[in-house]
C-alpha cells in the first residue's frame, strides 16, 4: 500500500479544523459529540484524510463510551498501532496505515470474538452507506 504524504498546509486546506486537530495533531473529540458515535446504518468507515477503508458497520458496537467503537478493523493492514505515553498513561494509538492519520486508540475490553475495542474519533472517519 503506497503512503500518502502531504504538508501540514495541504492537510489543513483539505480538512475541517476539527478533522485537522484530531487526525494530524493526535486530538480527541469530546465524548458523545461525534457524528458517528450512535450511527447504526450499514456501511463502511473510511479515513477522512485519504479514503482508506478502515472499519465496517458489521463490527461496530455500542461501548457506552461516546465514541464509535469497533471490535476489528475491516483489514488489519489498513491500520497501524503504536504505543502512546501521553496524558500520564500508556495506551495503544491507532493510525491509518496509508496517511498516518490519528484515528483513536484500541483497548482490551471489547466484546467477542476479538476482545478488542477500537475507540475511534468520528472526526477521523467518513461514513459511506451500503448501497
Curated annotation (Swiss-Prot):
Q: Which UniProt keywords apply?
A: Metal-binding, Oxidoreductase, Zinc
Question: Which annotated residues bind Zn(2+)?
Answer: 47, 50, 96, 99
In short, the EC number is 1.8.4.12
- Pfam families tied to this protein: SelR
Q: A GO molecular-function term, please?
A: peptide-methionine (R)-S-oxide reductase activity
Look up the record and report any one GO term of the cellular component aspect: cytoplasm
Q: Which GO terms describe its biological process?
A: protein repair; response to oxidative stress
Q: Which reaction does it catalyse?
A: L-methionyl-[protein] + [thioredoxin]-disulfide + H2O = L-methionyl-(R)-S-oxide-[protein] + [thioredoxin]-dithiol
| Residue ranges occupied by any MsrB domain in the UniProt entry | 8-130
**What's the domain of life for this entry?**
Bacteria
> Where exactly are the transmembrane stretches of this chain?
none
- Tell me how the cofactor is bound: Binds 1 zinc ion per subunit. The zinc ion is important for the structural integrity of the protein.
- Catalytic positions are 119
Q: Which cofactor does it need?
A: Zn(2+)
Q: Record keywords: Zinc included?
A: yes
Q: Provide the family line.
A: Belongs to the MsrB Met sulfoxide reductase family.
The protein, known as: Peptide methionine sulfoxide reductase MsrB
Species this chain originates from: Acaryochloris marina (strain MBIC 11017)
